[in-house]
Amino acid sequence: MLDTIESYIKSHKEKENLYVKKNVSIIGSPLAAGQPLGGVQLACDDLRKLGLHNVIDVLGWKYEDIGNIDNGDNEMKQEKKTNNYINNNDNNNDNNNDNNNDNNNNCYIPNGVIKEKKHDLSNNKMNGYVNHNFYGNYEENNVISTNDKYKNNCYYDNIRNIKEIGIFSKNLFDTMSNELRKKNFVLNIGGDHGVAFSSILSSLQMYQNLRVIWIDAHGDINIPETSPSGNYHGMTLAHTLGLFKKKVPYFEWSENLTYLKPENTAIIGIRDIDAYEKIILKKCNINYYTIFDIEKNGIYNTICTALEKIDPNSNCPIHISLDIDSVDNVFAPGTGTVAKGGLNYREINLLMKILAETKRVVSMDLVEYNPSLDEVDKKVHGDSLPILDNATKTGKLCLELIARVLGYDIV
């Protein structure tokens, strides 16, 4: 009997993560500027309060809590005096009118940069909605072309709160890069999904063969030309893939970084996709699996197929970007962008378990949990993790999913 136990312990140790030590770096990313709802910035501290540290500890992992990323308020106040961007449309109150001439390109220009006269797809926007003629312009102008970023000196000006997001993202990138160098598993807790740009790019600079599993109800793959809202959390994946055609104010720090490749990415569980996102998904060669694919083939077959597709040799490090709205709102009501028919409790837990069993997960985002929208849950007999008895439903699920990635299992 003793030999059997020792053999089990030995085999278990041999299956430890191939890339990181058994040490978690916790980073709180309380960014809410990428979407319109308040409350999502509270998630980091809420999960700490509900028992995050105890959950990690009981699973045998050490942890370092780095605290929350500075939201950049001080830097933003200082930059008001030295802001180097000017909006060329300040003197034009009708900059969304399709009848404007070519000189109105809806973009920021840094001082000293000469503005090019060229067709700009953002002129196809009218009153916040994309003109139907965009379909023709989309193909004609080859909007979706990876590794073609920043090819001109024109700047986007239709991304909401981009100054706050850009400054925050630089702070997160620097902090996460430092933690990755320690060979720790890095847990990045949002905040909205806009925080994934910095977390993925920092992981990608550390692990150049990184693969990404993006779990979400939404594609988050709009580009500024197609976004109906201008909210950055709906464009984050496109930005991370290098699909933007112009420069982004306050993201100059990222221009020379290695960007994610679509073929190294799999989106799991999408079910609420904007019209132009459908075109982008099909055109950019990314791997995606809708909720119908999961219903038809099962979550096990779906994630195994996705892993085979993006990592056929099963030897690459993995980053998980988990948007909690991928889960059906029956199980995860505490999120701002709810869509019916999401992953159920067993599916999302099994998905995390399968990814954990690869022993190659090096970093993870958990985003879009909004405690202010959550519901109190009831403790049941199977709740064995050290989570507060009065924990909310989505908060408890978030901690359970983190635990799954760290190896929490039934037996």
From Swiss-Prot:
One Pfam family for this entry, by name? Arginase
Pathways per UniProt: Nitrogen metabolism; urea cycle; L-ornithine and urea from L-arginine: step 1/1
Resulting phenotype, residue 381 to A? 2.5-fold decrease in affinity for L-arginine
In terms of pH, the activity is described as: Optimum pH is 8.5-9.
Signal peptide positions are none
What reaction(s) does this enzyme catalyze?
Answer: L-arginine + H2O = urea + L-ornithine
A GO MF term: manganese ion binding
Kindly state what the record says about how the cofactor is bound.
Binds 2 manganese ions per subunit.
Q: Which PROSITE patterns match?
A: ARGINASE_2 (PS51409)
Signal keyword on record: no
Family, according to the entry, reads as follows: Belongs to the arginase family.
> Cross-referenced PANTHER family, in alphabetical order?
ARGINASE
Protein task: Catalyzes the hydrolysis of L-arginine into urea and L-ornithine, which is a precursor for polyamine biosynthesis. May play a role in parasite intra-hepatic development during the host liver stage.
Q: How does it assemble?
A: Homotrimer; oligomerization is dependent on Mn(2+) binding.
Protein name according to UniProt: Arginase
Organism for this UniProt entry: Plasmodium falciparum (isolate 3D7)
